[in-house]
Amino acid sequence: MSKVLFVKANDRPAEQAVSSKMYETFVTTYKEANPNTEITELDLFALDLPYYGNIAISGGYKRSQGMELTAEEEKAVATVDQYLNQFLEADKVVFAFPLWNFTVPAPLITYISYLSQAGKTFKYTANGPEGLAGGKKVVVLGARGSDYSSEQMAPMEMAVNYVTTVLGFWGITNPETVVIEGHNQYPDRSQQIVEEGLENVKKVAAKF
């Protein structure tokens, strides 16, 4: 049985947030098409994960060197391990998030920091880093109110680009991406943009 991991990084309600609506649409469609799949859903805002900083990093370093960890470091390392192992064990993963202030919400950055561990999702080699998680099937769902397709705006899109860059670093070079954009910039076409985007979400979910 396939293990599927759904990761949502938006705590706003679906009636107000397009990426939340994308997430709900994908999960509902996928469950209908795959009733026997083992599914785990992570709501990153609800989890309130501790920031990835000195305690977790020092704990990981000490463990790798066979040094004794403090109780605080043990707890931080165990938290990182929990989510890292969960990700590694998943056959399929879906990320859903908005673009806020040109990038992803902070909880997703924290979560990705947990996952980006040398020897687990990538390794160092003489020729540079090499990804270790390339066997996964991944979908990226992103929403942004402005249209970032122009030459001027594209460099400012650091949400989907950030996530897909990190995935590529881990060896996941072909994630399927569905983006809904411009629904705030083009209010006269907002409903159409969102509806067409959600139809694309359903199509991807049905065959995921």
UniProtKB/Swiss-Prot annotation:
- Keywords (A to Z) from UniProt: Flavoprotein, FMN, NAD, Oxidoreductase
For whether the record's keyword set contains Oxidoreductase, the answer is yes
EC number from the UniProt entry: 1.6.5.-, 1.7.1.17
* First-level EC class: oxidoreductase
Q: Which cofactor does it need?
A: FMN
According to the UniProt entry, its GO molecular function terms are: electron transfer activity; FMN binding; oxidoreductase activity, acting on NAD(P)H as acceptor; oxidoreductase activity, acting on NAD(P)H, quinone or similar compound as acceptor
**Annotated TM spans:** none
Co-factor: note: Binds 1 FMN per subunit.
What does the record give as the reaction this protein catalyses? 2 a quinone + NADH + H(+) = 2 a 1,4-benzosemiquinone + NAD(+); N,N-dimethyl-1,4-phenylenediamine + anthranilate + 2 NAD(+) = 2-(4-dimethylaminophenyl)diazenylbenzoate + 2 NADH + 2 H(+)
Question: Matching Pfam families, A to Z?
Answer: Flavodoxin_2 (PF02525)
The function of this protein is:
Quinone reductase that provides resistance to thiol-specific stress caused by electrophilic quinones.
The annotated subunit structure for this chain is: Homodimer.
Record's family?
A: Belongs to the azoreductase type 1 family.
Against NCBIfam families, the record matches this protein to: PRK13555.1, PRK13556.1
Task: Identify this protein by name.
Answer: FMN-dependent NADH:quinone oxidoreductase 2
What species is given as this protein's source?
Bacillus anthracis
Gene name, please?
azoR2
